[in-house]
Regions:
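Rieske [2Fe-2S] iron-sulfur-binding domain
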Residues: 1-113, 163, 183
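C-terminal catalytic domain of Rieske-type non-heme iron oxygenases
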Residues: 16, 93-275
């Protein structure tokens, strides 16, 4: 489901990715159950077959003299595969935006980690929670108990009301949260919001949090994609700008720390504990 529409996505036998209406134009059977064969998706009910553009290719239950497949077409959306993610555009054809070229989409595949997870809330609620920094003094307090870097151990506890500064940009905004530390030092954390649904974290260096376990510098972020008014799919990405790619152990750690590992999710990407 995407923006309230029930769609089916598939990669045909030629490697092309299609995204189209889930239901067959004939009797509205779900194409999620369809057979992916010879350049198209065939409905299991009466065998109507569609290509990645939604064009009907075959109507085996229709007599040759009444075959009208040329007049049948499902609603379909254009797709592009960039950075290991399938992107689509669902708006007016005359306003198609350029393809995304964030740095994480341009690095080799083994330098990035991707995951996704379904959140049962509106996408804007999820986005607001992600870019909110003030909650960390309470919600994430326990995460700093074992920190080893001097000066950072108690900053959540000692400065629970950070000073927030917002900087408007042409892509959205950046805001910083500044917390006072002992000995007249400050801890400054910045988030980037890139319209319409991206959050960028600051670079993670190898002294605290998950980066310490990776031993590599990383940048990470989230995309909050609306499924409908009550559900969103959160895409999590991390990439390293180190000389060496992410190892198998790095990817396992990121799977546990960011989003959820695959064994913690149901088939529709819900967390198991939320079933």
């Amino acid at each position: 489901k995407l923006l309230g529409e029930k769609l089916v996505a598939f990669r045909d036998t030629e490697g092309r990715v299609g995204l189209m209406d889930e239901f067959c134009a004939h009797r509205r059977a779900s194409l999620f159950l369809g057979r992916n064969e010879e350049g198209g998706l065939r409905c299991v009910y009466h065998g109507w077959k569609y290509d990645t553009k939604g064009i009907c290719l075959d109507m085996p239950n229709e007599p040759a003299e009444t075959n009208f497949k040329h007049a049948v077409r499902l609603k379909a959306y254009p797709t592009a595969e960039v950075g290991g993610v399938i992107w689509t555009y669902m708006g007016p054809a005359e306003k198609v935006p350029p393809l995304p070229k964030f740095e994480w989409t341009q690095v080799p595949q083994n330098y990035r980690h991707l995951s996704k997870m379904r959140q049962e809330c509106n996408w804007l609620q999820a986005l607001e929670g992600a870019i909110d920094n003030a909650h960390a003094g309470f919600l994430h307090r326990a995460l700093t108990d074992k920190t080893t870097r001097a000066g950072l151990r108690g900053y959540w506890e000692n400065s629970q009301a950070p000073r927030l500064d917002v900087h408007i940009t042409d892509y959205g905004f950046m805001y910083t949260a500044t917390r006072a530390l002992p000995e007249r030092e400050n801890y400054v954390r910045a988030y980037q919001y890139v319209m319409p649904f991206h959050q960028f974290f600051p670079s993670q260096i190898a002294h605290s949090g998950s980066a310490a376990k990776l031993k590599k510098p990383t940048v990470r972020g989230h995309m909050f994609v609306p499924m409908d008014d009550e559900n969103s799919m959160v895409y999590n990405w991390t990439y390293t700008f180190a000389d060496q790619p992410l190892s198998e152990a790095d990817n396992e750690q990121l799977g546990r720390h960011i989003g959820s590992a695959s064994d913690e999710l149901t088939a529709d990407f819900r967390k198991l504990r939320n079933r």
